[in-house]
Amino acid sequence: MSVSVHETRKSRSSTGSMNISVFHKASHPDCVLAHLNTLRKHCMFTDVTLWAGDRAFPCHRAVLAASSRYFEAMFSHGLRESRDDTVNFQDNLHPEVLELLLDFAYSSRIVINEENAESLLEAGDMLQFHDVRDAAAEFLEKNLSPSNCLGMMVLSDAHQCRRLYEFSCRMSLVHFETVRQSEDFNSLSRDTLLDLISRDELETEDERVVFEAILQWVKHDLEQRKAHLPLLLRNVRLALLPSDCLKNAVSGEALLMADECTKLILDEAFRCKTKILLNDGVVTSPFARPRKAGHTLLILGGQTFMCDKIYQVDHKAKEIIPKADLPSPRKEFSASAIGCKVYVTGGRGSENGVSKDVWVYDTVHEEWSKAAPMLIARFGHGSAELENCLYVVGGHTSLAGIFPASPSVSLKQVEKYDPGDNKWTMVAPMRDGVSNAAVVSAKLKLFVFGGTSIHRDMVSKVQCFDPSENRWTIKAECPQPWRYTAAAVLGSQIFIMGGDTEYTAASAYRFDCETNQWTRIGDMTAKRMSCHAVASGNKLYVVGGYFGTQRCKTLDCYDPTSDTWNCITTVPYSLIPTAFVSTWKHLPA
């Protein structure tokens, strides 16, 4: 039954008044489209015929142009097809797929199933039926499995379906040990393989799996692919191979010794391995950077908000184990990891004095030491590792600081620490000073989300620092103003969780730092203000936080492939988490 609406309005003028009736029939567009479809099926008023294979499809140019930018351009830019009454796709398009797209153009409905989804994605992209392409991609997302995820990576990359690509890539990373044995793996392009093996999220604690996979791929088409071996080898964490495996690779693998570039790479890996075994200083080589599955999760906390202990999370055994005491208990500090070391910066001590101190915890030897102090005493700041250096961002300081500011002012100043020379330097200040912001690094840049401004307002900006240019820019607006949130990174995706308002406390979002686009993901299991998050493997872990008078007592895990949150374990009541970091495990001999 159709519904129509009459609106009566009165318009006054110097000559009197006049009634105006506005009639609106909401179902009119559907009625027109349905009748156009009837006309098409009876070949009435059609002005172009599309051919696919040996089948003809009479259509109306106006409907095609209104449904697809491809046809709009074809019929309006003086192309031959704008004058001809036929368009022949020959065998480039399956007739059944074209028929489905035309039915969609004339009805706004389409049935997608396992048999037609890939073809609809390809044809939807080719003919610029982008809604159909995206709907097919969404269908394929829901039907991803280890048996098809590599094929979906290739398909989505070819047709610019970024979300499907990321989902497919993530599943391939999770199941790498399985998918590398498939025929699809041997058919990957060099760039797709490189994207997989270069990611920290690739789930294996045995780097031999990756090493053997690239040799397998190269040998599958040796003459064409052997030139790619040096580039691929540089993205294997060679220094994490057991010593005997690294030696056997050199002595027993002729393919590796046949190329001078490859030999130089292996020599560099050997030097890095030797440095690790001798514990000879800070190891920052990409060859020694473990995958996230090979990281240890550490919680810093205490019985009050004054942090005095480090705990290790065993998320497989679902245990939280006390590890070491902090030499100097503090609150409102920041903690980040570089390699096997945790850097605890600033904060306030037991007498509320603001500190410049930097304490370093070596997870391999379970020892504390002091690094050079920061240039500015800070609390309520953020920190993140970027290219083996530590960046400290924003926060508050005391009146007696090097850069005087009242405790209520949020700092713009940003410091960089180089562990190699144990020195702090100033880099470009932020566009807007903030405290209590979420700070992470991704894709060789630093990102700062929200925070508290110098006017004590919540900030809704995404500030980004590019160290190659020493410059800050505003990348995007947050979905709402934020502070006291947590952030963690998986590839190019940054996940933001929690906040200090009723609306934000349980919410979670995904920010794509390459497209600067936001996506809402599933809410957390509880409201959390001042929670903390890290990534491990292809999952996120969130701990701590409170809302109102309620403390959050669970360690929760988020799985992006299913968009679900699950409780891993309960945090001991005596532990109030104040920081959460992910460090390298002890490196293999």
Curated annotation (Swiss-Prot):
Residues 149-250 form the BACK domain. Kelch repeats lie at residues 296-340, 341-388, 389-444, 446-492, 493-538, 539-585. Disulfide bonds: none annotated. Residues 46-114 form the BTB domain. Keywords: Kelch repeat, Repeat, Translation regulation, Ubl conjugation pathway. It comes from the Eukaryota. Pfam families: BACK, BTB, Kelch_1, Kelch_KLHDC2_KLHL20_DRC7. PROSITE patterns: BTB. GO terms for biological process: negative regulation of fatty acid biosynthetic process; positive regulation of CD4-positive, CD25-positive, alpha-beta regulatory T cell differentiation; positive regulation of fatty acid oxidation; protein ubiquitination; regulation of translational initiation; ubiquitin-dependent protein catabolic process. Pathway: Protein modification; protein ubiquitination. One of its GO terms (cellular component) is Cul3-RING ubiquitin ligase complex. InterPro entries: BACK (IPR011705), BTB-kelch_protein (IPR017096), BTB/POZ_dom (IPR000210), Kelch-typ_b-propeller (IPR015915), Kelch_1 (IPR006652), KLHL25_BTB_POZ_dom (IPR030565), SKP1/BTB/POZ_sf (IPR011333). CDD domains: BTB_POZ_KLHL25 (cd18254). One of its GO terms (molecular function) is ubiquitin-like ligase-substrate adaptor activity. Substrate-specific adapter of a BCR (BTB-CUL3-RBX1) E3 ubiquitin ligase complex involved in various processes, such as translation homeostasis and lipid synthesis. The BCR(KLHL25) ubiquitin ligase complex acts by mediating ubiquitination of hypophosphorylated EIF4EBP1 (4E-BP1): ubiquitination and subsequent degradation of hypophosphorylated EIF4EBP1 (4E-BP1) probably serves as a homeostatic mechanism to maintain translation and prevent eIF4E inhibition when eIF4E levels are low. The BCR(KLHL25) complex does not target EIF4EBP1 (4E-BP1) when it is hyperphosphorylated or associated with eIF4E. Component of the BCR(KLHL25) E3 ubiquitin ligase complex, at least composed of CUL3, KLHL25 and RBX1. This is Kelch-like protein 25. It comes from Mus musculus (Mouse).
